Amino acid sequence: MTKKVSRRLRELQAKVEDREYGPLDALGLLKETATAKFGEAAEAHIRLGIDPKYTDQQLRTTVALPKGTGQIVRVAVIARGEKVTEASNAGADVVGSEELIDEIQKGRMDFDKLIATPDVMPQVAKLGKMLGPRGLMPSPKGGTVTFDVASAIAEFKAGKLEFRADRTGIVHVMFGKASFSPEDLLVNLKALQETIDRNRPSGAKGRYWRTFYVSATMGPSIRVDINALRDYKLTEAA
């Protein structure tokens, strides 16, 4: 069945030409098409030339967005002993040991990011079926399994994001709020591009970036010229 497109979205789509836009032009258009009645996120949707069913073609990493996410991030920490106190002092919103694991098993999910120290991971592993589908399962690659809980808390609250390519090789990631200036969005988008290039899977062959779109949460997709973004010097946006 064909999905009905709203009149609002049709009008916004009419503003977007079928071509690749330069980075700043694309982000200016993203802001222009963010007309929903709530604070929309700025999103990137990137199809990469990888097949994640092969282990050497998987992408899972983190990016530190210099201008932040524009969101308040609630961080939970599962640890033991002095690390519980360290996490509390570092500003974690939820902290606990085995009792927090039990609460999560019973359905507690009032956090956006879960950090665990390596010594509790055998117990945290039993939460996989609950946390995995929500993208909350701690992992070393995601920077969420660490004894340095204070640094991890600070980084995620400041704008560090974990992302991965899905089973079709597409990365969906939020890189700020549509209310940010185009220049601030560009700083974050450049950080994302550099992170994806730096973490290119060893098994990736041929053209790495296949298609690259940005959009507001409820807005139309806007195609971005990846080569122009790669070549962009951030001083040009100043």
Swiss-Prot record:
Subunit structure: Part of the 50S ribosomal subunit.
Superkingdom, taxonomy of origin: Bacteria
GO cellular component, one term: large ribosomal subunit
PROSITE patterns assigned to the protein according to its UniProt record, in alphabetical order: RIBOSOMAL_L1
Protein name: Large ribosomal subunit protein uL1
Organism: Nostoc sp. (strain PCC 7120 / SAG 25.82 / UTEX 2576)
Sorted UniProt keywords: Repressor, Ribonucleoprotein, Ribosomal protein, RNA-binding, rRNA-binding, Translation regulation, tRNA-binding
SUPFAM superfamilies: Ribosomal protein L1
